[in-house]
Amino acid sequence: MAAELGRLVVEGFRSIRRVELDLTTDVTVLIGANGSGKSNLVSALELVSRIWDDSFQDYLYRRGGISNILFEDGEGRADHILIELLPGFNEDDRRSGYGVTLVPDLLGDSDRARIQEQRLFQAGSDRSDIHREIFRHGLRSSVRQIADSEEARRYVESLTPVLEGCRVFHFDDVSGDAPAKGWSTAGDDLSLRSNAENIAAYLLRVREDHSRHYQRIVAAVRAAAPFFDDFVLEPSSNERIRLRWRQRGLDRTFLAREASDGMLRFICLATLLLGPDRPATIILDEPELGLHPAAIHLLAEMARIAGRNGHKVILATQSVPLVSHFELSEIVIVDRVDGATAVHRPDEDLLKAFLDDYSTGTLWEMNFLGGRPSHTEAAL
């Protein structure tokens, strides 16, 4: 079973002054108005994964540099970004956590980030630090080395998989040159990449080594698109492969670009959520894009399957039909309060009387949950 992410703390990042979010359910569904900060919570988790593999400078550069993503309100701009991740509590009611603080590199390029501090800490009644790293010119991440050190190793057995397995997936690009439509190396098959660029290679390995998972993926795609027969996964002579598929009743083979946008996105989602090599924490921003209501129902079921198998699934969505497939306990409402992102969970005791007549999504649509546009808040 994968190590589970239990808590996320974000401070000074985009629209987030400070947010503390406990992830108490297998699936967490973030809902809120446009500009409330759902995608910023997703981006904070993506930044952590980039710090883990030391690609965060490029990640920040492509977003305009760290100075462009610091929280700002009428009182000024934040001087740092802090992110903390904690897994669930162990049997001793304790857990090890990881925290990182980023600041602009005022000694060099102010758009470049400097790691002011990385730390491992044991969370419990005293929240005592296990290991602390302070850098004078910390332009690179050493979190892997910290986690592997002799001093910290015995504390972080549950933490390292959380950091390694925190993955944000983006399947929204279905343009003509979308990654999922292109060629990839047949050997690039250990796990599905975040943009599905190696989906054909990955599906080939799943078919050869994990036939039950492969059949579940095929069955899910057939349920969403009944005309679908199977994938055609055959590497070329130079060990390159691309996604192809067959339609029932026809002899010809179709390319990925001949699938509808919704069908291609659903193939990527099914491959991720039903595959054998799911990361510990799966994060998806607006996964419902382009999906038929029947496919949205299947998406919810696949997310639950991943959650039941020891993975955390975090969905940020605008979809009332998708929200309707989840319980109030799985919902987190994201609002803008006093110019900053704030999160809370619905009051189940207050709302349970309505659930006999209304779905969770309908309650959201009727503004019983919050997470709707507020005219008292300025737009982004």
Where are the model-predicted features located?
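Conserved ABC ATPase signature
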Residues: 215, 219-274, 281-297
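Conserved P-loop NTP-binding catalytic core
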Residues: 42-107
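Phosphate-binding glycine-rich loops of NTP-binding sites
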Residues: 25-63, 195, 266-272, 319
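Conserved catalytic network of the ASCE P-loop NTPase/AAA+ motor domain
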Residues: 75-76, 91, 274-277, 305-309, ...
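Electropositive, glycine-dotted interaction segments
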Residues: 90-224, 229-232
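C-terminal lobe/lid and adjacent interdomain/linker elements of RecA-like ASCE P-loop ATPase modules
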Residues: 1-2, 300-380
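N-terminal pre-Walker A segment at the start of P-loop NTPase domains
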Residues: 1-17
